[in-house]
Amino acid sequence: MVKIDLITGFLGSGKTTFIKKYAKYLLDKGMNIGILENDFGAVNVDMLLLQDLMGDNCELEMISGGCDKETHRRRFRTKLIAMGMCGYDRVIVEPSGIYDVDEFFDVLHDEPLDKWYEIGNVITIVDAKLEPELSEEADYLLASEAANAGSIILSRAEEATKEQIENTIEHLNRALEQVQCKRRLDREIMRKDGAELSKEDFDKILKSGYVAENYRKMELDEKKGFDSLYFMELKISADELKTQVAKMMQDPECGGIFRVKGFVKDDAGSWMQLNATGHEISMKPIGDGQQVVIVIGERLKEDCIRKYLEN
């Protein structure tokens, strides 16, 4: 049977960065792997960030969101059936930061997937400097992603103070309590950033498995507040985009923006990757890109956001 891992993490937590490290570790062990990008929106930016992993022993597949729950589940199941015929040793599923974890377990119990795949690990990435106050819906997503995790990695731990790390762990456990989950997290948490993880750390992660935990479910239609907005072919410089994103993330009239990501060309015509969260905004060179900016958050106001990006 093919081992399959789920790697979750709330918006902007650093899942894709961790997956690059984890995939390289698996490739160094001689494994043949497939990575399935399962995004919330209709455009998948993270696929471009993983392109350098592609090779004889690593293939990338994609499911775009932007559809209803049943359609998305059907696409996920169909893609896993196709990948089950490719001879992989391991499949890594990276969903969006807004994901119903139950879908993963439910689909893998369907025939014929229950005979082809064995769940390996559920790994959750959490920002070590997690916002102290989130909405009820956001806390639910945080709890639902952590509840079944065999290991939890604190991204950006090297940038966080000891107090911030402890506050993040307290927040995780508080979110679990709010959904009536009995689990409390401590030993499962690796207080290291992905860049600091050693081979021995990855050996532990590879064997961490998952936990079948119960908690009070919130129906997806109760989370209508989560949105993703797409802005294509913007006529804006890289420097100006970074400035405008910083302003709109501080403007409550735009809604609650969790994450902004995408690509833009600089003055020399080279691609730059934008990645913005509540903690930082970065603009880094990248080999290839797509002229798109994606804004993800709660109850977003498109007209207000568009003014920042297009005027």
Task: Label the predicted regions.
Residues 1-2, 311:
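Short, Lys/Arg-enriched, disordered terminal segments
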Residues 2-13, 17-135:
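Nucleotide-state-sensitive switch-loop elements of NTP-binding domains
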Residues 34-36, 261-264, 295:
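Short, hydrophobic beta-strand segments that form beta-sheet elements in well-ordered domains
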Residues 37, 126, 276-278, 297:
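Flexible glycine-/small-residue-rich
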Residues 83, 98-183:
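Conserved C-terminal guanine-recognition region of P-loop GTPase G domains, centered on the G4
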Residues 148-154, 159-287, 299-302, 310:
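C-terminal accessory "lid"/substrate-recognition subdomains
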Residues 288-296:
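C-terminal engagement modules used by replication, chromatin/transcription, nuclear envelope/ESCRT
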